[in-house]
């Protein structure tokens, strides 16, 4: 096991100074200097070239440590000297862009044609685990809910266009995906003048009829508050009219959501653990001052609809864990990564039998000891990050207070 110094990203949507959990963990873990006036958004843990981690004992990049022995023969054969995943902590003060991430064919195409904006050729499915209450928009709502919003929110219906809405309703039963794609394409090509014309109407309705905004079944006060909040951060933005098309979820600590490639989403607020395939590719369409690639996104989204609950990832007990603590497995339907959450109370021990691949372990709460099977001993406290070699059994012990650790890993 090797202790790491990791990379902190400062983006405008991050929490400021010591309000940022990402910054506080980096400060506690390796002495990162926190500026009280700077927004700190992400803590990156991995070997991605846009924000690599370094081994504290040697000062060398983590990638130089990756060999068939440390990551396992199968993982090394497929991924070489780069980890297949990127592990993060996000501290969200302001809504992130409405975005999607490419699948593998699109990732290769975008990197080839526009390497300035798309810096690698990989896909980027990702999973978020809430550390605090976490609000997000994720995936297209069921068509029934979209229809209700179009019926009950006049400024939304009029913004998209009455004729476009009629065509949507007339074709949705024959081909739901195509009907949604056509309607969404119409919405995304409205000009700035129209956005500025209808935004005040949408926000005013959210304020004046808060409890009934969008209908009580799927809308109501929480949804009207969301519209008002988003407009305060990004006034007159196309994202405001996209929001009713997407599921709005509030996750509690320990709950998780998996986001497939080419599914639209936006993180609204909170602190999360995030893991993804090792990519930094983002296709944006709203709530951002950065480059928007609307044509690419509109032409490549899945347009699959589902309710919010179907996108949640339910953790299960981890079969390779034993002891008096508790270890849960978050296992998305891809090979690049899974996440473990381990909780150990004072006086308890929890063993994680050797994982057949590389892992990165982050301590978020408490203090204790890590023990390897060959006499390796290391202390743990919040912000400590360790790279764990393949097939390396671990025992996690808590000393004076409960310990919580998250561990991203890849097994093939």
From Swiss-Prot:
<keyword id="KW-0862">Zinc</keyword>
<feature type="binding site">
    <location>
        <position position="99"/>
    </location>
    <ligand>
        <name>Zn(2+)</name>
    </ligand>
</feature>
<dbReference type="InterPro" id="IPR046458">
    <property type="entry name" value="PMI_typeI_hel"/>
</dbReference>
<dbReference type="GO" id="GO:0006486">
    <property type="term" value="P:protein glycosylation"/>
</dbReference>
<dbReference type="InterPro" id="IPR046456">
    <property type="entry name" value="PMI_typeI_C"/>
</dbReference>
<feature type="binding site">
    <location>
        <position position="126"/>
    </location>
    <ligand>
        <name>Zn(2+)</name>
    </ligand>
</feature>
<keyword id="KW-0963">Cytoplasm</keyword>
<comment type="function">
    <text>Involved in the synthesis of the GDP-mannose and dolichol-phosphate-mannose required for a number of critical mannosyl transfer reactions.</text>
</comment>
<keyword id="KW-0479">Metal-binding</keyword>
<dbReference type="InterPro" id="IPR001250">
    <property type="entry name" value="Man6P_Isoase-1"/>
</dbReference>
<dbReference type="InterPro" id="IPR018050">
    <property type="entry name" value="Pmannose_isomerase-type1_CS"/>
</dbReference>
<dbReference type="InterPro" id="IPR011051">
    <property type="entry name" value="RmlC_Cupin_sf"/>
</dbReference>
<comment type="similarity">
    <text>Belongs to the mannose-6-phosphate isomerase type 1 family.</text>
</comment>
<dbReference type="GO" id="GO:0005975">
    <property type="term" value="P:carbohydrate metabolic process"/>
</dbReference>
<dbReference type="GO" id="GO:0004476">
    <property type="term" value="F:mannose-6-phosphate isomerase activity"/>
</dbReference>
<dbReference type="Pfam" id="PF20511">
    <property type="entry name" value="PMI_typeI_cat"/>
</dbReference>
<keyword id="KW-0413">Isomerase</keyword>
<dbReference type="InterPro" id="IPR014710">
    <property type="entry name" value="RmlC-like_jellyroll"/>
</dbReference>
<dbReference type="Pfam" id="PF20512">
    <property type="entry name" value="PMI_typeI_hel"/>
</dbReference>
<protein>
    <recommendedName>
        <fullName>Mannose-6-phosphate isomerase</fullName>
        <ecNumber>5.3.1.8</ecNumber>
    </recommendedName>
</protein>
<dbReference type="Pfam" id="PF01238">
    <property type="entry name" value="PMI_typeI_C"/>
</dbReference>
<dbReference type="GO" id="GO:0008270">
    <property type="term" value="F:zinc ion binding"/>
</dbReference>
<keyword id="KW-0539">Nucleus</keyword>
<feature type="binding site">
    <location>
        <position position="101"/>
    </location>
    <ligand>
        <name>Zn(2+)</name>
    </ligand>
</feature>
<comment type="pathway">
    <text>Nucleotide-sugar biosynthesis; GDP-alpha-D-mannose biosynthesis; alpha-D-mannose 1-phosphate from D-fructose 6-phosphate: step 1/2.</text>
</comment>
<dbReference type="InterPro" id="IPR046457">
    <property type="entry name" value="PMI_typeI_cat"/>
</dbReference>
<dbReference type="GO" id="GO:0009298">
    <property type="term" value="P:GDP-mannose biosynthetic process"/>
</dbReference>
<dbReference type="InterPro" id="IPR016305">
    <property type="entry name" value="Mannose-6-P_Isomerase"/>
</dbReference>
<dbReference type="GO" id="GO:0005634">
    <property type="term" value="C:nucleus"/>
</dbReference>
<feature type="binding site">
    <location>
        <position position="265"/>
    </location>
    <ligand>
        <name>Zn(2+)</name>
    </ligand>
</feature>
<dbReference type="GO" id="GO:0005829">
    <property type="term" value="C:cytosol"/>
</dbReference>
<feature type="active site">
    <location>
        <position position="284"/>
    </location>
</feature>
